[in-house]
Amino acid sequence: MNLKNKLKGFPTIYYTNLDHRNDRREYMETQFDYWGIKDYRRVSSSKYLSTEEEKWEHLVLDETLLFGSAAVANSITHIEMIKNWLETTDDEYMVMMEDDYDLSLIEYWNFDWEYLMNQIPINWDSVLLGFENKEYIPFFLHPFNYNHSFGPCLINRDYAKKIVKLHYFDGKFKLNIKINDERLKKVFGMADCFIPHSGVTYAIPLITNNPDFGSDYDLNGEPRGWFKECRDLYYEWWQKEHHKFTLNEFFNYGKPNDGGMVRHLKYMNKIKTIAYL
């Protein structure tokens, strides 16, 4: 294990960024430089702007969608990004993320990328390298939970082909592919839903968001009050708690002590209290 070069072999990162958000671009690329990440690509999120829906809405084959134009634009941007990756590289894997993620916790990883790749289950299609959840964060590798948010994501080539086959047809996009989970019916067709739910996805809490860039608001401008608390839990875990558990415990689930590696948010208790009052 090479802890002096933890990211050796890390796949190319594709990160999405609006053209006018140079602050976010500089933030991400400064982080990449700091960690010695040379293989990254910026993907413009401005090709499909929610404010210019009339320019691209004809490319969406769905007659009805349950979410706003910002989420639609984000979804077709991700599909096109994955398609372009398949057509322009022979890479086995890619990592996709948005431009508001904090890579600082890499400092505390007590393993390298090669070790991680040797630990993830053999049947994986995608692995979330970070996520938020309104209720709790399991600080170990585990199957993706429907209530997790979508975050930095590792996907393999076969799964990328499946996503494109499901959602891309002769230059147009079909988003609303049903997933038979009633808890998700309001987000069928969103990239946040179809990328983790169209195959076998695992989650591992490695990378957190940076709410200073407004990442605690969703694509419709609604506040996500739990994001900052999740970030605080990530920092608490990696700075103070992760050394209490072995790597074997961190990279496996279904253990007798899983409960001791879960951290609960106060956010939902606050919401319930407000509702009660």
Q: What do the PLM-derived regions correspond to, one by one?
A:
Residues 1-97, 101-277:
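An acidic/histidine-cluster motif and surrounding catalytic segment
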